Amino acid sequence: MRGGFGRGGGGRGGSRGGRGGFGRGGGRGGGRGGGRGGGRGGGRGGGRGGGRGGAGAKVIVEPHMLHPGVFISKAKTDSLCTLNMVPGISVYGEKRIELGATQGGDDKKEYRLWNPYRSKLASAIYAGVSSIHMGPGSKVLYLGGATGTTVSHVSDLVGPEGMVYAVEFSHRVGRDLVEMSKRRPIVPIVEDARYPMKYRMLVPMVDCIFMDVAQPDQARILALNAQAFLQNGGHYVISIKANCIDSTLEAPVVIASELNKLKKDKLKPLEQVSLEPFERDHAVVVGVYRPVKKSKQ
């Protein structure tokens, strides 16, 4: 469930987490969505795989009440999905739902199911985070792009008017991002996120930074990139894996320490959610960089 920033900094998002729903934006559930998958990445490519759903059963797709660009597929179980920018093509073997004019549209639309066991951003939405700050037209710097599972969904969110700048250290994995960028608004950057000046000519000022880099110094990496690319009042979303930072301490203690580091670098935390049951000892923190003070009228 949504955690706060009460005593101890770790908030209530700690170990309980609950099964999560869709926050205030829809029904329960979502099920397991096809197994645990593989952390950030998932398998390569996917090509035209994945298959289409909704052929026999009645499926209704509704916009999420809290997150622009995110939809809820209502069938036997409710699932998150995004509007596929490239209809007919699956990125990582995900299921697709094709709907026609029966829901009031003139053209057919295709939605891609968003599996919370393969995307920490999706699991944060299931857990009830109130905003991810990646709506249509947004410019997003994505640190830790991996094979592009979540990157592809973020590109659906920002749409053709937005852009995703995806940084990934691995050259082998980066090839998948390069291939994906041929069809989606993605700028693939194969570099080390610790050195943002190496890609300063490729990234403009952005509206939001999403970070999924499991490193002990991830708070410092986020701060360096925020100083280089995040506009004042811009937002960040960071996935914190406690065991990767300090496996000798309890997860809430580690997360509280990371929050303090963020605050020192003017990265003010706004909310925190636990990713249970999708990920153990993980939390997602949403915050704002150098918040702009509202002028008094």
UniProtKB/Swiss-Prot annotation:
One of its GO terms (cellular component) is nucleolus. GO terms for molecular function: methyltransferase activity; RNA binding. Residues 1-56 are annotated as: Disordered. S-adenosyl-L-methionine binds at residues 149-150, 168-169, 192-193, 212-215. HAMAP family: RNA_methyltransf_FlpA (MF_00351). By homology to other fibrillarins, some or all of the N-terminal domain arginines are modified to asymmetric dimethylarginine (DMA). Component of box C/D small nucleolar ribonucleoprotein (snoRNP) particles. It is associated with the U3, U8 and U13 small nuclear RNAs. It comes from the Eukaryota. It comes from Leishmania major. The modification Asymmetric dimethylarginine is found at residues 2, 7, 12, 16, 19, 24, 28, 32, 36, 40, 44, 48, 52. S-adenosyl-L-methionine-dependent methyltransferase that has the ability to methylate both RNAs and proteins. Involved in pre-rRNA processing. Utilizes the methyl donor S-adenosyl-L-methionine to catalyze the site-specific 2'-hydroxyl methylation of ribose moieties in pre-ribosomal RNA. Site specificity is provided by a guide RNA that base pairs with the substrate. Methylation occurs at a characteristic distance from the sequence involved in base pairing with the guide RNA. One of its GO terms (biological process) is methylation. PROSITE patterns: FIBRILLARIN. Keywords: Methylation, Methyltransferase, Nucleus, Ribonucleoprotein, RNA-binding, rRNA processing, S-adenosyl-L-methionine, Transferase. It catalyses: L-glutaminyl-[histone H2A] + S-adenosyl-L-methionine = N(5)-methyl-L-glutaminyl-[histone H2A] + S-adenosyl-L-homocysteine + H(+). Its EC number is 2.1.1.-. It is an enzyme of class 2 (transferase). This is rRNA 2'-O-methyltransferase fibrillarin. It is found in: Nucleus, Nucleolus.
